[in-house]
């Protein structure tokens, strides 16, 4: 979240956002005019808040293009990019309307003659990732479910990483199994505790559900104007990420840390 906030502060335009599970940050990018295309498998804050109303408005009005893939297909696109191959064969999306997106093609299995989907590789220009810890060489460790981050990092041309903790390389060597992103693919590393907030960072702090409730109520009441006010208050007004965290307060951050400890033991 720290890096996404900085991109918004720089008032970038014309970006394509690609993420398997796209959350409210995409709404911030749409309303701020930073993105004109979103490639995803799902978009919303979470089940309690339903389908993104902002996404519906911007897509249906033609202001933003949305390209929908299956969860597996997007994962395979990143995996193909990480492997350096042009596509990977799969059964995903066959027989669905999603086959019409992104120039998806089919091929014949040379062994059985069956029809397969040829899922094209995805090579992001820039990958923005957050990890639990990293050493000074950029070797990154992720606790819990690593999602697609390792493949995304290998597929991207430029990789920007924020980390909760900086560790000595001796610690990296002591637990090589935890290192899922090697330093040779990382271009920039920034130490940013709570860098994923108000989202969760497994084992360290939980997502601030109350904050998302407040945000969703603002969207329900004011639509895109509510999002614009949110961007002004949480992105442009705080001069630093520390100032941004001050908007939540230390007690609130500590509460999310306690919730994470309760869930992970």
List PLM regions with ranges.
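Conserved alpha/beta enzyme-core scaffold
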Residues: 1-265
């Amino acid at each position: 979240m720290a890096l996404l906030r900085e991109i918004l502060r720089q008032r970038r335009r014309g970006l394509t956002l690609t993420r398997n599970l796209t959350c409210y940050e995409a709404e911030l990018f749409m309303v701020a005019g930073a993105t004109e295309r979103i490639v995803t498998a799902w978009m919303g804050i979470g089940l309690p808040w339903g389908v993104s109303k902002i996404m519906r408005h911007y897509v249906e009005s033609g202001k933003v293009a949305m390209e929908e893939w299956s969860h597996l297909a997007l994962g395979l696109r990143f995996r193909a990019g990480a492997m350096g191959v042009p596509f990977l064969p799969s059964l995903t999306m066959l027989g669905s309307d999603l086959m019409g997106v992104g120039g998806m093609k089919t091929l014949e299995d040379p062994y059985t003659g069956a029809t397969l989907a040829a899922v094209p590789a995805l090579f992001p220009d820039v990958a923005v990732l957050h990890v639990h810890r990293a050493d000074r060489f950029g070797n990154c460790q992720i606790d819990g479910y690593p999602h697609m981050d390792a493949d995304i990092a290998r597929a991207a041309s430029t990789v920007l990483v924020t980390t909760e903790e900086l560790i000595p390389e001796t610690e990296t060597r002591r637990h090589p199994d935890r290192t899922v992103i090697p330093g040779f693919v990382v271009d920039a590393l920034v130490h940013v505790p709570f860098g994923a907030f108000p989202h969760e960072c497994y084992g360290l702090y939980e997502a601030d559900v109350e904050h998302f409730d407040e945000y969703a109520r603002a969207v329900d009441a004011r639509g895109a104007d509510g999002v614009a006010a949110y961007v002004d208050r949480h992105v442009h007004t705080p001069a630093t990420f520390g100032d941004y965290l001050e908007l939540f307060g230390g007690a609130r951050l500590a509460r999310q840390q306690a919730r994470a400890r309760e869930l992970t033991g």
